[in-house]
Amino acid sequence: MAVEGGMKCVKFLLYVLLLAFCACAVGLIAVGVGAQLVLSQTITHGATPGSLLPVVIIAVGAFLFLVAFVGCCGTCKENYCLMITFAIFLSLIMLVEVAAAIAGYVFRDKVMSEFNKDFRQQMQNYSTDNQTALILDRMQKDFTCCGAANYTDWATIPGMTRDRVPDSCCVNVTSGCGVKFNVKDIYVEGCVEKIGLWLRKNVLVVAAAALGIAFVEVLGIVFACCLVKSIRSGYEVM
């Protein structure tokens, strides 16, 4: 009876963890989509290991949701094969997450280098490509920045002059405010450094969330193994 009661408790906790997995899966997908939206506006000339990380995060989130469904079915039916599959897949997800975290750390400088290069390339097309102009204007407004390194980068761009920057560089945006501007009326800091700082701040949040998800996954594997052992021993835990 004590063993049966303990397994009932394990089964209940596993249900709770499965709900947590679903929440984690949705969170991973949201983070991946958000990161992809940011990178899609900046890194456009070929894929790098760093720029592929959002795709990996989204894939892991979707797979985790599927694994949680398998675990729910296995727990409900007390199916040995499903629970073994659940534990194995959950372990694989942990390995992928660890690999993604390592790749993110290793290629962090590469991502910023690609961002800097592509930002400067897009600046060259500012006057001839409306879509590029819209993207750069939105970034400069959102991150209160101007140019790649600073506002003087615009002086060498075709269609610009030394006394002109895009209106999106202005603190208070009005039509033509970037022509013959006063330095005190525009953002002078570059977008590469500003966005890099924003990314570094958010990496800490993502890292903390990843640790929490990993802890939940370890508990899920442990409880799944306990239930598998119970099923194999022939205990009834309904």
From Swiss-Prot:
Topology: which residues are Cytoplasmic?
1-11, 73-81, 225-238
| Main localisation | membrane
Provide the topology term for how it sits in the membrane. Multi-pass membrane protein
User: One of this protein's GO BP terms?
Assistant: positive regulation of receptor internalization
| SUPFAM superfamilies hit by this protein | Tetraspanin
Residue intervals on the Extracellular side: 33-51, 103-203
GO CC list:
cell surface; extracellular region; late endosome membrane; lysosomal membrane; melanosome; multivesicular body membrane; multivesicular body, internal vesicle; plasma membrane
Q: Which residues cross the membrane?
A: 12-32, 52-72, 82-102, 204-224
Question: Which keywords appear in this protein's UniProt record, sorted alphabetically?
Answer: Cell membrane, Endosome, Glycoprotein, Lipoprotein, Lysosome, Membrane, Palmitate, Protein transport, Secreted, Transmembrane, Transmembrane helix, Transport
Q: List the glycosylation sites.
A: 125, 130, 150, 172
Entry keyword Transport: yes
**Localization:** Cell membrane; Lysosome membrane; Late endosome membrane; Endosome, Multivesicular body
Instruction: Give the motif span (Lysosomal targeting motif).
Output: 234-238
- What PTM annotation applies here? Palmitoylated at a low, basal level in unstimulated platelets. The level of palmitoylation increases when platelets are activated by thrombin (in vitro).
**Domain of life where this protein originates:** Eukaryota
What Pfam families does the record point to?
Tetraspanin (PF00335)
Protein family (similarity comment): Belongs to the tetraspanin (TM4SF) family.
Described by its record, this protein's role is as follows: Functions as a cell surface receptor for TIMP1 and plays a role in the activation of cellular signaling cascades. Plays a role in the activation of ITGB1 and integrin signaling, leading to the activation of AKT, FAK/PTK2 and MAP kinases. Promotes cell survival, reorganization of the actin cytoskeleton, cell adhesion, spreading and migration, via its role in the activation of AKT and FAK/PTK2. Plays a role in VEGFA signaling via its role in regulating the internalization of KDR/VEGFR2.
The annotated subunit structure for this chain is: Interacts with TIMP1 and ITGB1 and recruits TIMP1 to ITGB1. Interacts with CD9. Identified in a complex with CD9 and ITGB3. Interacts with PMEL. Interacts with KDR/VEGFR2; identified in a complex with ITGB1 and KDR/VEGFR2 and is required to recruit KDR to ITGB1 complexes. Interacts with SYT7.
Instruction: Output this protein's name.
Output: CD63 antigen
**Could you tell me which species this protein originates from?**
Oryctolagus cuniculus (Rabbit)
